[in-house]
Amino acid sequence: MAKVAKDLNPRVQKMSLGQQQSARGVPCLRCKGTCSGFEPHSWRKICKSCKCSQEDHCLSSDLEDDRKIGRLLMDSKYSTLTARVKGGDGIRIYKRNRMIMTNPIATGKDPTFDTITYEWAPPGVTQKLGLQYMELIPKEKQPVTGTEGALYRRRQLMHQLPIYDQDPSRCRGLLENELKVMEEFVKQYKSEALGVGEVALPGQGGLPKEEGKQQEKPEGAETAPPTTNGSIGDPSKEYVCELCKGVAPADSPVVYSDRAGYSKQWHPACFVCAKCSEPLVDLIYFWKDGAPWCGRHYCESLRPRCSGCDEIIFSEDYQRVEDLAWHRKHFVCEGCEQQLGGRAYIVTMGQLLCPTCSKSKRS
């Protein structure tokens, strides 16, 4: 009898289950008060109460998000963006860059200050360039603490970078041979596709960080001449966005991808997933077919994703209907949860239903 992968790391598995239990009761952002609070399904990534996704309940915390990104970036060339957790048995955490803007407000004798905190900001740039970058992102997607933009970022971290696409202990019931396939899959994408975008002025992508922080030109200073490797921008050159083909002004930040090479750049709002067109959260991307993808859609482009549990399928034995796939054990009605293998079923708008539940839903 094959041994399931969750038994291979009981300590981490217990932590995963504990996190799920602690998330009970978290309100749904989509249902706006009609949901009684998150009630985890035993294997679907949804709330049993309202049927909305985990993302709609924003279950993760800053610490959980930083640990997840730290795990993703460790053992890759981007591990410098992580830090070792003291006493954490080799666990690394994401060194997330935050940006705090403090502006004085003139109100009588005692000065007061308006403070804005960005929960994430591009690393390795000056505050001025970081603020310029933020101003080029749609306001509703700027990750300012306490705003819809901060919630949007957290939801995208869950959606674009599912923890169960990189951590076998977060998958349910992996067989030992499937575990080996997954470990190789993760190792390969970290080596061949994973990337983190770099913010710089046009023509300055790829500079060492120490130099990169000097990207702002002092008033009255002469423009630096281009170097032989092209790392300093040529003032006579026109830089064009790889996506929209619009001009990138020389004094406005762009995003670079080392996987693409530093001859290509994107406007901040144009650095999006090639599949879903959503901005790439924290500039984390996966390079494929000459374009950046989010983690979710990159993984789906290589292997099928189960429409039931939302996990990547690492077995060659699974159920497929048109362009949808299921683990065989998850090929069940979304209404009554009965197994549908060998039985009549109906797929409507991506929902797998038995004839009875389908009829009930229509009425």
Swiss-Prot record:
Gene Ontology cellular-component terms listed: cytoplasm; nucleus
Modified residues (Phosphoserine): S16
Biased composition (Basic and acidic residues): 208-220
Keywords assigned: Cytoplasm, LIM domain, Metal-binding, Nucleus, Phosphoprotein, Repeat, Repressor, Transcription, Transcription regulation, Zinc
Location (main, coarse): cytoplasm
Domain of life of the native organism: Eukaryota
Gene Ontology biological process: positive regulation of calcineurin-NFAT signaling cascade; regulation of cardiac muscle hypertrophy
Annotated region (Disordered), positions in chain: 200-234
Residue ranges of domain LIM zinc-binding in the record: 239-304, 305-363
Cellular compartment(s): Cytoplasm; Nucleus
InterPro entries: PET_domain, PET_testin, Pk/Esn/Tes, Znf_LIM
Summary of the function given for this chain in its UniProt record: Transcriptional cofactor that restricts GATA6 function by inhibiting DNA-binding, resulting in repression of GATA6 transcriptional activation of downstream target genes. Represses GATA6-mediated trans activation of lung- and cardiac tissue-specific promoters. Inhibits DNA-binding by GATA4 and GATA1 to the cTNC promoter. Plays a critical role in the development of cardiac hypertrophy via activation of calcineurin/nuclear factor of activated T-cells signaling pathway.
Name recorded for this polypeptide: LIM and cysteine-rich domains protein 1
